Amino acid sequence: SKIAQEVEPIVNPNTLEKPNLTIGYVPVNDCAPFAVAWEKGFFRKYGLNVKLTREASWATSRDGIIFGRTDAAPVVSGAVTNARIGAEGARHAPLCAAMTIHRHGNAMTMNRAMWEAGLRPWREYNGNLEEFGRDFRRYFDGLPSEQRVWAVVLSSSIYEYFVRYLSAAAGVDPLKEFRVIIIPPPQMVTNMRIGAMQAYMVAEPWNTRAITGNEGVGFTFAQGKEIWLGHPDRLLGVMESFIEENPKTYRSLVKAMIEACRYCGDPNNQVEVAKIITGRSYTAAKPKKCRAPVVINEDNIQSLPKCITKFTGPGIIGEYNYGGFDQQKRIAKSLDTTIFFDMPANIPQEPGEHSTFLWRSRSVWLMTQAARWGQIAQIPGNAEELAAKGWRADLYREIAAELGIKSPKEDYKVEPPEVFIDHKGFDPSDPVGYLKSFEIRANRPSQFFMA
């Protein structure tokens, strides 16, 4: 972009092992830091010449890194862990990540039939999992088995785990009561319209697009933060060999992305960021009735009408509409709808914590879920070693410190009960005990009673 070209590099590209990079992204709201790093010149500032490539799905975003088509790309938070442990037949690959792209920014959408059956947004159940479970089971019990379908963006993603976690917390066994299928984000709304699934979980703007006043095919049941407050979503994925062979380049990449995340998280920039990602090169989520230029660039971004952010704005700006089919307004204003850097005060946090910091303990949590749902036979005995190899909090600390950013001193933390929908906390020092505490899980030993 013109703005990027005017940025004076503070790192000489000739000092980098690989200054020319190909970086993937997926057309969802969390492409924002990649778009901003490119449009605002953060890549150029750190000596990088980046070509962005739009990926069709989270599978191609991950596989592009593994097969060397891209140098880096966002991956779902479970991708690095699952490539290390081979969850559900995943290709074993030494994927790494030193930073989170964002936290939150995703939601569960249910179709109109579920609304008409009496289901409502989670916030209207006032924390009553039993009541939700009754409504949920009643609806699915009335469907033939082939229609009991919930869609997510990738197998073994945190979205799949959230769908199963929610269902099990409400007393409905997700291994027996419905199927989980994989659909790329841009295809979710269309597939719901034709009845391919009853519900789905995806990043914005593909939940907002579904509600009344937009596509009108569904309503938002819950944001992901209502399942686990403060959870990580996307990570900046690379291969381990990339870090080893290009240490200076990698530091430049992480610095550029940290700065881009800080820019996206600044409330003063959120409307602009929401406008940028409506561009055809990014989400292409531009309302048809909003009069705006076909091409969105730095020359016209400030003058674009706010209606252009109808789809991308709620998740970025934090005025989130749950929708519904009863003409009632369900708009929740919050600072934590999508978190790119600074942590809102309502989220339990450690000194120095910001959203781009990776907690290795959360990689262990992902392993507990892979084991819980039968994607691996058991939690690996070397879980901490695998987490350390994949989630490079050590590198992040060093790189962030060079930017004057303090980070938490520890790699592990206890997740308190209040952040989970079922109020069951997670102590990473006892992952096996945590796994066994769940009544509903795969491979649970049968109990035999003898008179």
Please identify what each model-predicted range represents.
Residues 108-109, 235-238, 242-243:
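Short glycine- and hydrophobic/aromatic-rich loop-to-beta-strand nucleating segment
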Residues 54, 58, 101, 156-160, ...:
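Solvent-exposed, acidic/flexible segments
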Residues 247-392:
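Secondary-structure end/capping motifs
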Residues 173-178, 244-252:
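Inter-helical turn/loop segments and adjacent helix faces that build the functional surface
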Residues 3-181, 197-230, 419-422, 428-431, ...:
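Short, glycine-/small- and polar/acidic-enriched structural segments
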Residues 3, 364-451:
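Conserved C-terminal helix/tail region of periplasmic/extracytoplasmic solute-binding proteins
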